[in-house]
A protein has these predicted regions:
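ATP-binding pocket architecture of kinase catalytic cores
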Residues: 2-121, 125, 132-137
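Short, polar/flexible loop-turn hinges at active-site or ligand-entry regions and domain interfaces
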Residues: 74-75, 148-150, 170-173
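Catalytic activation segment of kinase domains across protein kinase-like and atypical kinase folds
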Residues: 113, 125-166
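Active-site activation/catalytic loop segments of kinase-like enzymes and analogous catalytic loops
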Residues: 156-194, 210-222
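ATP/Mg2+ or Mg2+-diphosphate-binding catalytic cores
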Residues: 212-252
Length: 252
């Protein structure tokens, strides 16, 4: 038996044991496992297969692939990568549209104004994508802890925010983008993959940025845990800067 910590997740208590990911169980885990099981039965091969729950942990099948991390992988920084990300977002959205949660499902964002809309992943950033480096394509979408209801198009706008990227050059350079950043070309490519106009996508990005920021700001020290942690470290300040950047880009 091998037992190795999931890269970058040691503080979250995640370990990989013989091809199974063991993660601490949350009050949302049963709902997420029902969703993941449904995705598997629906033929969506990019999400982890649920492998059980007990009182302390959830278990998921490990997905082979290259974790994104920082800086962004060369492929995702290419126009083909932006187009592939847009197509992925559309495919994910189309599949999730058919899902119906189990009765009494509890998601991490459980109730309130921010828990409305179709079920979505909730955190589709490059950091949760796995890549097949040899084939140059997305081979996995992990960390479904923030799955649940969200405004229509939330996942697509969220991913576009970081793939295009809709943030200032300093923040983009921290993620590995090299000047000059071809935001016009990347936005066009992402929209080609997703299937809407650039103006419509920019509206989605701002909507996703604002929704994410509001989820953080309305969190309390009692939860939801992920948003409470982000609030504690001041991520909302960075998001507000990104919202301003995106709106200025829209107006230019």
């Amino acid at each position: 038996m091998t037992n190795s910590p999931g890269a970058g997740f040691v503080d979250r208590g995640i370990v990989i044991v013989d091809g199974v990911v063991r993660r601490p169980r949350g009050y949302w885990s049963a709902a997420v496992h029902d969703l993941l099981g449904w995705l598997d039965r629906a033929g969506f091969s990019l999400s982890p297969k649920p492998a059980g729950l007990d009182e302390q942990f959830e278990y998921l099948q490990y997905i082979e692939g290259t974790g994104q991390g920082w800086p962004l992988l060369p492929f995702i920084q290419s126009l083909d990568g932006a187009r592939a990300a847009g197509a992925f977002a559309r495919n994910l959205e189309s599949i999730l549209a058919a899902y119906r949660p189990i009765k009494g499902a509890r998601w991490q964002l459980d109730g309130g104004a921010h828990a409305r809309g179709p079920i979505q992943h909730g955190d589709v950033g490059p950091w949760n994508l796995l890549w097949d480096s040899a084939r140059g394509e997305i081979c996995g979408l992990i960390d479904w802890d923030l799955a649940g209801p969200a405004p229509a198009g939330y996942d697509a706008g969220f991913l576009a925010w970081f793939v295009i990227p809709m943030m200032d050059d300093f923040r983009a350079h921290e993620r590995g983008f090299v000047s000059p950043i071809d935001r016009v070309g990347r936005l066009r490519a992402y929209c080609d993959g997703y299937g809407i106009t650039r103006g419509e996508m920019l509206d989605l990005i701002v909507s996703s940025q604002e929704e994410f920021c509001n989820r953080i700001l309305t969190a309390s020290e009692h939860g939801p845990p992920t948003y409470a942690m982000l609030k504690e470290v001041g991520i909302d300040e960075l998001i507000r800067k990104d919202i301003l950047f995106t709106r200025q880009y829209q107006a230019s």
